[in-house]
Amino acid sequence: MVEWTAAERRHVEAVWSKIDIDVCGPLALQRCLIVYPWTQRYFGEFGDLSTDAAIVGNPKVAAHGVVALTGLRTALDHMDEIKSTYAALSVLHSEKLHVDPDNFRLLCECLTIVVAGKMGKKLSPEMQAAWQKYLCAVVSALGRQYH
């Protein structure tokens, strides 16, 4: 279980309050698929991902970015039970979808870049530290089934 200070909880909540899931979700997934092209292999049914423009203009990528970020947002309401919150999703990604668990980390890195771009100087080092702790807890929970 991850231990959270009151300040860390406030910082994570503050970051989430600045995130528009419908904007940041697609941007984070688009960035992940472009920067780390090997992650595209899990999205073959999404159609054309052959160019950056195709990825950015792909409505299935955008929709899945919203789904992924909505799922990531779930942890905010369950910060004291992140592992159990993501247990079923971990099983799905490991046993059915066979997703490399490192891809969760890559997506979260891309999300952090998107969030930093949106928040600018308002994303203080303390906020970023709490945000990274939150993302690491979720990534660990999603990868738990792989261990």
Swiss-Prot record:
What organism does the UniProt record list as the source?
A: Gadus morhua
Describe its assembly: Hb 1 is a heterotetramer of two alpha-1 and two beta-1 chains.
Transport as a keyword of this entry, yes or no, is yes
Can you quote a single GO CC term? haptoglobin-hemoglobin complex
Q: Which family does it belong to?
A: Belongs to the globin family.
Binding, heme b: H64, H93
Which part of the chain is the Globin domain? 3-147
Q: What does this protein do?
A: Involved in oxygen transport from gills to the various peripheral tissues.
- Identify this protein by name: Hemoglobin subunit beta-1
